Swiss-Prot record:
Belongs to the eIF-3 subunit I family. Keywords: Cytoplasm, Initiation factor, Protein biosynthesis, Repeat, WD repeat. It comes from Cryptococcus neoformans var. neoformans serotype D (strain JEC21 / ATCC MYA-565). Pfam families: EIF3I (PF24805). WD repeats lie at residues 8-47, 56-95, 151-190, 194-233, 235-274, 291-331. Component of the eukaryotic translation initiation factor 3 (eIF-3) complex. Component of the eukaryotic translation initiation factor 3 (eIF-3) complex, which is involved in protein synthesis of a specialized repertoire of mRNAs and, together with other initiation factors, stimulates binding of mRNA and methionyl-tRNAi to the 40S ribosome. The eIF-3 complex specifically targets and initiates translation of a subset of mRNAs involved in cell proliferation. HAMAP family: eIF3i. It is found in: Cytoplasm. One of its GO terms (biological process) is cytoplasmic translational initiation. Coiled coil: none annotated. SMART domains: WD40. PANTHER family: EUKARYOTIC TRANSLATION INITIATION FACTOR 3 SUBUNIT I. This is Eukaryotic translation initiation factor 3 subunit I.
Length: 341
């Protein structure tokens, strides 16, 4: 499984996402730009921002999200701004300004709403906002959210939309997982006794019935989206920064590693800078893919399950296209059903 290595960032990666077709990958970095890449050959298609005095971000870009039509791109940064871009032209269509950094953005499944999370800082609370999008005239957007959730407890770090867009699921600094009503902004459910440290990533399953969380407590957990019950736990020896659920195959991929400041040697093994594959049902590790020279900060899986990508502290993105053997593998033999190829 030889990777395609994407070299286009000068600093560490914060978030990478495939588009719905899987032919493009978008990467957000601490170097203030977002890049778009062809996943088939690693060619850079374009850059959003990065021009001095232009309308890009001024500082780290923490988060990126692309709509299901690959028409619009949302980004959020350390400059307290959220930006709407046209994918095709690279043009910034609109900018929202906040009082603190934008740590996460996400589209709902109908592409008619999106959420943003702003940081708790300088006396400002962590705020989750739900906006509607004007797709007809994208340069004319409302600065007023439909719903605003000002959090009094632990700050939110990540969030996803539940199917039908009635609820959002949030992960928090304390390890709490919560469900919020999109219309009322009320917290309708919360679990505070599963993860014991910051939630670094949250990603939905392909069918929308469950989701996975990654945490600094060195575990990833699989949750039922209706009940918020933990179904499976995947345990490692280092903080988990990102976790994905592979479509069609029974695997979970985890990325993380010892924080850069705590690594005393450049050995990949010492820092555990590998993508780690776990069996979804049996919770056992079944394989590793090495290559990065720093902790993996972000993972994304191809929507059809044909590849996955990792972005790391070393500034590189690696796209791994799975070989035929991956789709036929049965690490637990007769305990598993025959793969559908």
């Amino acid at each position: 499984m030889k990777p395609i290595i994407l070299q286009g960032h000068e600093r560490s990666l914060n978030q990478i996402v495939f588009n719905s077709e899987g032919d493009l990958l978008f990467s957000a970095s601490k170097d203030s730009v977002v890049n778009a890449w062809y996943t088939s050959n690693g060619e850079r298609l374009g850059t959003y921002g990065g021009i001095k005095g232009g309308d890009g971000h001024n500082g780290s870009v923490w988060t990126v999200a692309v709509d299901s039509q690959t028409r619009f791109l949302l980004t959020g940064g350390a400059d307290n701004a959220m930006k709407l871009w046209e994918v095709k032209t690279g043009e910034c269509l609109y900018t929202w300004e906040f009082l603190t950094a934008v740590k996460r953005v996400a589209w709902n499944e109908d592409d008619d709403m999106f959420l943003s999370i702003t940081e708790q800082r300088s006396g400002q609370p962590s705020v989750i906002r739900i906006f509607s999008i004007n797709r007809e005239d994208p340069r004319s957007q409302s600065t007023t959210p439909i719903t605003e959730m000002r959090l009094s407890g632990s700050r939110a770090t990540v969030a996803i939309w539940a199917p039908l867009s009635d609820y959002i699921i949030t992960g928090h600094e304390s390890g709490k997982i919560a469900k919020y009503d999109v219309k009322t902004g009320e917290e309708v459910q919360a679990v505070e006794d599963e993860h014991s440290a910051l939630i670094s990533d949250i990603q939905l399953s392909p069918d929308g019935t469950y989701f996975i969380t990654a945490s600094k407590d060195k575990t990833a957990r699989l949750w039922d989206i209706e009940t918020l019950e933990v179904m499976k736990v995947y345990t490692t020896e280092t903080p988990v920064n990102s976790a994905v659920i592979t479509p069609d195959r029974p695997y979970i991929i985890l990325g993380g590693g010892q924080d850069a400041m705590n690594v005393t040697t450049t050995s990949q093994r010492a820092g555990k800078f590998e993508s780690r594959f776990f069996h979804k049902l049996f919770e056992e590790e079944v394989g590793r893919v090495k290559g990065h020279f720093g902790p993996i900060n972000t993972l994304s899986v191809h929507p059809q399950g044909r590849a996955y990508a990792s972005g790391a502290e070393d500034g590189f993105v690696r796209v791994h296209w799975f070989e035929e053997s991956y789709f036929r593998s049965r690490p637990f033999g007769d305990l598993e059903p025959e793969p559908e190829v």
